[in-house]
Amino acid sequence: MIPQVVTNETITTISPNGINFPQKDESQPTQQRQDSLKKHLKAEIKVIVAIQIMCAVTVLALGIILASVPPVPYFNSVFSVLLKSGYPFIGALFFIASGILSIITERKSTKPLVDASLTLNILSVSFAFVGIIIISVSLAGLHPASEQCKQSKELSLIEHDYYQPFYNSDRSECAVTKSILTGALSVMLIISVLELGLALLSAMLWLREGVLTSLRM
């Protein structure tokens, strides 16, 4: 009869050829860790995608509003660069597309889809960065445009010898226009900064998912 030594519920068998230790299956804990990381990744992606799409819709809506307003003297040149760049439209569509593709990839994680999501998010980072620069330049140009508007109103009033009440009304018109544009562009700038952060985070998550997918293959 072969003697057995029992220690901590682990059976060690002593045979004439030596001591045989039982081999532990290390693949199961590794698989559990990968499954846990995958579940955590899916939860993070759902939250990021929801915020990303809402921000993109807001940028698109603000772009449509700015494009549909009637010509505003002295202020048109300020935000026309933003509209001509196409950022409120093309950038927003890229953000929405990357969000939708992230949802599809989260449900069916394959290497081509993961690579496509990573590429779209990298492009979204580029668009957000360019958008932040353009919006910042537009915001900086609002004050000079407002001053030109006020000076033009003053000259017009002097030439036509208008009364003081009309003068105050025209000056307030310039101030109100500046305030509205400042608010709209500031909201777009904040959302663009948020989109930049979300796109960077999404790119990092999909990069990690790509590594995990390669390990499983």
From Swiss-Prot:
Protein keywords: Membrane, Receptor, Transmembrane, Transmembrane helix
Membrane topology: Multi-pass membrane protein
Region called Disordered, residue ranges: 1-33
Gene Ontology CC: one annotated term: membrane
Places the protein is found: Membrane
Sequence ranges on the Cytoplasmic membrane side: 1-46, 106-121, 208-217
One matching Pfam family: CD20
Cross-referenced InterPro entries: CD20-like (IPR007237), MS4A (IPR030417)
Transmembrane domains' residue ranges: 47-67, 85-105, 122-142, 187-207
Polar residues compositional bias, start-end: 1-20
Expression by tissue: Expressed only by thymus, spleen, peripheral lymph node and bone marrow.
Extracellular face residues: 68-84, 143-186
Similarity-based family: Belongs to the MS4A family.
Known function: May be involved in signal transduction as a component of a multimeric receptor complex.
Protein's name in the database: Membrane-spanning 4-domains subfamily A member 6C
Organism: Mus musculus (Mouse)
